[in-house]
Amino acid sequence: MLRACQLSGVTAAAQSCLCGKFVLRPLRPCRRYSTSGSSGLTTGKIAGAGLLFVGGGIGGTILYAKWDSHFRESVEKTIPYSDKLFEMVLGPAAYNVPLPKKSIQSGPLKISSVSEVMKESKQPASQLQKQKGDTPASATAPTEAAQIISAAGDTLSVPAPAVQPEESLKTDHPEIGEGKPTPALSEEASSSSIRERPPEEVAARLAQQEKQEQVKIESLAKSLEDALRQTASVTLQAIAAQNAAVQAVNAHSNILKAAMDNSEIAGEKKSAQWRTVEGALKERRKAVDEAADALLKAKEELEKMKSVIENAKKKEVAGAKPHITAAEGKLHNMIVDLDNVVKKVQAAQSEAKVVSQYHELVVQARDDFKRELDSITPEVLPGWKGMSVSDLADKLSTDDLNSLIAHAHRRIDQLNRELAEQKATEKQHITLALEKQKLEEKRAFDSAVAKALEHHRSEIQAEQDRKIEEVRDAMENEMRTQLRRQAAAHTDHLRDVLRVQEQELKSEFEQNLSEKLSEQELQFRRLSQEQVDNFTLDINTAYARLRGIEQAVQSHAVAEEEARKAHQLWLSVEALKYSMKTSSAETPTIPLGSAVEAIKANCSDNEFTQALTAAIPPESLTRGVYSEETLRARFYAVQKLARRVAMIDETRNSLYQYFLSYLQSLLLFPPQQLKPPPELCPEDINTFKLLSYASYCIEHGDLELAAKFVNQLKGESRRVAQDWLKEARMTLETKQIVEILTAYASAVGIGTTQVQPE
């Protein structure tokens, strides 16, 4: 508030000093008591004070204009030649160029096309800033609003107005200076008209563009999804084939180890075992071949998927980045899974290769040993060769055995020497092998690290792309919000201008029209007013009579209808009462369904009656209720049984307790009837007193109070009286509903009889 007051004061001072409206008036003619010297001194003081005030106002205006650019704009628009004063003192305004003044015309508004708006909106912010800095201010000032509004063209559904002077696009004129619009430009800008597109057209174009982009995004997402589905299917098949190959290689290795370990098995079993090994080898080769084929297919599909993703990136469809990022993540996961399975297959094949080499060495050693035996014992029968030593122990002679033992000693010595040499040689081989293994492991480790780094880099790149996309979306939303606000402000300004112009034109037209029509209207009113008054009076009189007749007839018909319904309801309720009271020894209860249906049929449009009839217990409708006489007769039997089991609580005590309770009922003689007190004490709440109170109430016709006393019973006495209490409750509920219906029917009947005389 203080700032507004200061602003208004400074503005007024600036207007007074710059426009020349502040006039120093001479003082009133004073009396001639003062000398001429004092008069000159007073005039000088006034002039000095005026100059000081004017200078202070100008200085304050300049200082405030330097601090607030909006105030400078308003002063430059309001006070002529103030812009030159500000430019001399403060310099040119930064990013603040006054729009050329032009008269508001009633012609259509001009607006830049959607294609121009979209082209300008797609420029990056850096280019826009560069264009703003390089282009002269007089050329960028008219198009600045169009650039601001065009950037929000994707989301706005309102027209994007913009002023497009013809000469504003010609930036090659050297006469146009920064911050100074030339007079020719101002005249041409003032003569150019403003055209505004209809909001429906702009909204339709934007909706069509959004629809096309959405269709492109959907088609791209569908193609990526189909390619991912196909690649995932082939990759899963390849992974399954690799797992099957691992299982086949491991099975063959296990069977081969078992065959080599069990060397003491008989011939037929051994041959069967080796046939099993051959079958496992065939299965292994088949599984490995299938795994290799599946791996090649999977690699081809992965390469195809990579090409599909690259093509999707090259299309540069707006909004498709999340789909591409998700597809890249899934592709990366498939590649990692496939690499892991391939590593498992390679490890299994390495282990199987070691087992195969071990088997070849064992077979070679056995063959060498057989050849040595053949050379040592040539006289041994051919049929004995190949048999075990235990089988040949009884068939060989002493010389043969001695020669075999001597050969065995020589062979052992030879093998010991070879073993020592082999140990020395193998130490060197092991050292070389360890170094070679270290190099191989280092290379494998380097390759694994490189591959892991590549996977990690791809994951980091995907995460970075996702974060960049999120930040870009947030910044675009913020930019669109700001641009939408500026566009809305510009649109509101144009709307206000058009509203003012419309009001001026409308007031002028209405004034002329009112002047021309006032005379004819007054004359026509004089002639028609009398006829209208007479006709209105006659119509009102006739209408009042007609309304009175209609109201009387309607009230009489309504009263008769209500009286008829009340009478029918009363008759139906009386029939229901009769059904409740009618009973015999053969039929103690009569179903009340027919009587209740009659009440519902007679009062089908009465919600109160329908609610009461719906509250009647269903068992009363189907079976009926016992009358009070029947309940009184049943009560005495229930009372007798309840007194017999008065000592039994809810836990149903032992048979001895039952006997004591029965004995108590025989020995005690409580009064059959006791008048219930106004308030029950804790001493009154026992089975005998409660039954005496209930008997008194039943004898005096108060079934409801008797049911309340019976409801206070506990233990076995309450269980004995449960059926009687249920029937009494049903009878009381039905009786209460019938009484309410009777009272309602009587009230409605009385109301209709009071309405009839009217």
Swiss-Prot record:
The modification Phosphoserine is found at S103, S112, S113, S223, S388, S390. GO terms for cellular component: membrane; MIB complex; MICOS complex; mitochondrial crista junction; mitochondrial inner membrane; mitochondrial intermembrane space; mitochondrion; SAM complex. Residues 1-33 form a transit peptide. The modification N6-acetyllysine is found at K211, K222, K451. The chain crosses the membrane at residues 46-64. It is found in: Mitochondrion inner membrane; Mitochondrion. InterPro entries: MIC60. Residues 34-45 are mitochondrial matrix. GO terms for biological process: cristae formation; inner mitochondrial membrane organization; mitochondrial calcium ion homeostasis; neuron cellular homeostasis. Residues 116-143, 162-200 are annotated as: Disordered. It is a single-pass membrane protein. GO terms for molecular function: RNA binding. Its main location: mitochondrion. Residues 167-178 have a biased composition (Basic and acidic residues). Residues 65-758 are mitochondrial intermembrane. It holds the Pfam family Mitofilin. Component of the MICOS complex, a large protein complex of the mitochondrial inner membrane that plays crucial roles in the maintenance of crista junctions, inner membrane architecture, and formation of contact sites to the outer membrane. Plays an important role in the maintenance of the MICOS complex stability and the mitochondrial cristae morphology. PANTHER family: MICOS COMPLEX SUBUNIT MIC60 (PTHR15415:SF7), MITOFILIN (PTHR15415). This is MICOS complex subunit MIC60. It comes from Homo sapiens (Human).
